Amino acid sequence: MMRRLGIFAAAFAVAAAGFILLGNAAAALITAAVTGALAGVFLLLRDRRLRAARIFLLGLCVGLLWCAGYRAVFLGRAARHDGERLPVTVTALAAPSETPYGAAVPVELPLEGRRLSCTLYLRESAEEICPGDCISCTAKLRLVDARSKKASDRYSQSHGVWFRLSAGTGAAVTHPAHPGVRFWPACFSMLLRQKINTVFDADSAGFLSALLTGDRGGLDMQTRNELSIAGIYHTVAVSGMHVSILLGMVMQLCGSRRRLAAAIGVPTIVFFVLMTGAPASAVRAGVMQTLLLLAPLVQREDDPITSLSAAGLFLLLVNPWTLLDVGFQLSFASAAGILLFAGRLYRALAERRALRACLRRGGIGGQLAAVLVSSVSCSTASMTFALPLSAYYFGTVSLVAPLVNMLTLWAVSLIFTAGMLIALLALVWTGAAYGPAWLLSWLVRYVLLSARGFSKLPCAAIYPENFYMTAWCVLLYGAILFYALSPVRPRFSVTAASLAAALCAALVCAYAQFHLPYFTFTALDVGQGQCLVYQRGTWTAVIDCGGSTWNAGEDAARYLQSYGEYRIEALILTHYDADHAGGAAQLIERQRVERVFLPRGVEASDLKETILAKAAERGTEVIFVDEDLLLSFDGGELRVFAPLSDKDSNDSGISVLASAG
């Protein structure tokens, strides 16, 4: 069966990708003319064998024309105000988020007859701002450059942000008596988060808020990292799983009444997608589930591939630069893998003798076996296309993901269903929601503790930081592709054993290279900061661990673990500025640090207290450098010099001299 919409959508996506990469409107228009002419020639030939080619060429032509004219149509003359400082009145589209310098607010800016999505940056707290509020201020307008390769610009482009507005302080906020209907989903999301924070314990409220509303602000970086390593971070990124669970609740309520299910389900899905901020993954799932509900009503058979194509085409028509969104790429890659290969993998696993007997037996055992096989099949199939993207963007390949998904996804489904009902109850009667919330918090803790426990296992995840780990990741991806595509599959146990043996060989080679009896001194790329790794034989020291982000400690841990090193003999922090010590606590959390050497410091420091608390928690010995120290080891030494002054944080820092040979 030829899926015309799928071919057209694929061609449109190829055209959008080509335009974004090249960024040449003139070349795009010429190419569109050529492809359009070829499509016309193929149409005149009336050869059925050329039907797919005609549709593909037409998709290329339309896609290139749409991308070439997109900014002119939607931005218009507003672009001429780039760099100007103007008095503006904008409307808040969602709740503000904190930044290191104040707050960022998604807003709508009326300019030159257009209503443009922008981000307003304030150098003050913005907690009182709600969706629908009017904000008046004087702001400098900075147009997001469509040809820029900066990560921040690409993120803005992928989310449809046209301008960044820098307003400083003194913004006047007006609260309307009744926000417009289009702000109801965002207002409801904000109210739901408030009730979740009220009735749930602090350690579970952040997870519930992320699961139900897509707001991950309540999850600390350590929890996010543990969820990522364990392979279940997708549970707190609103996606098809969440929309499917919500639709399942509606279907249970409506039974076999399809019209009622569509009448309730479609508005519910639309409201939920808007409530969670309409990320690409949620929109994709929303479109697919909506088509699933509507197909029987118009006497059509639901075709998942066509639904996936329709979702992609819709998102690219709204904003072709959505292609740059990592969530868009991962969502469609995972969905395509599941649609194409999950059924095949399920049948292959179900043919195994032991599983076949369990599945045929029925009862609770059969149901559990079906859930097990389904979970493993979907997890593996979703990796078919998503694995290289995950490795590229996040530098992580979780090995425990299939097992952790199998152990926790049932709990996540229950948490979502019960959590939504409890949050809705809290809106009506807050006091009655405390008891159920307390009970559900234990299930949330089970998921979080599972993620924490599995993330701390050796080789829970592989980090392609060196040749050996990268080669093994390529081998793993090849095995998944072979298992998914080949009609003749080797025994699963043989494949797993071969991959395990290859991983052991890669780890041994990496460990041997890192621990050869010579001196290595590595400066890690941690942004605006410093993290130095000194290694001689089996003795490892890290000097400073800070950067422009929290990730410095995680980056150092992943670098060391990619070489099979889970131990650090000495962590030396020269002073307590974030660019030198901001990632130290995370490094102590992720590695076995024997000793940490610190300056006394002359000022109270929250960062210092955080490092000391983490060291006490992990059993790391703390040594304050009040006098010069000599750390000797086989083949080298480190001289640690005490501070020469106590005037301020920089002057009271310690110095290190590394020697080898």
What are these regions (language model features)?
Residues 1-79, 284:
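N-terminal leader/targeting segments
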Residues 15, 90, 327, 386, ...:
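Residue-level signal for inorganic ion chemistry
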Residues 37-38, 54-55, 165, 220-402, ...:
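Hydrophobic alpha-helical transmembrane segments in multi-pass membrane proteins
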Residues 61-234, 554-561, 567, 601-603, ...:
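Membrane-interface helix/helix-cap signal primarily in integral membrane proteins
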Residues 391-437:
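Hydrophobic alpha-helical transmembrane segments of integral membrane proteins
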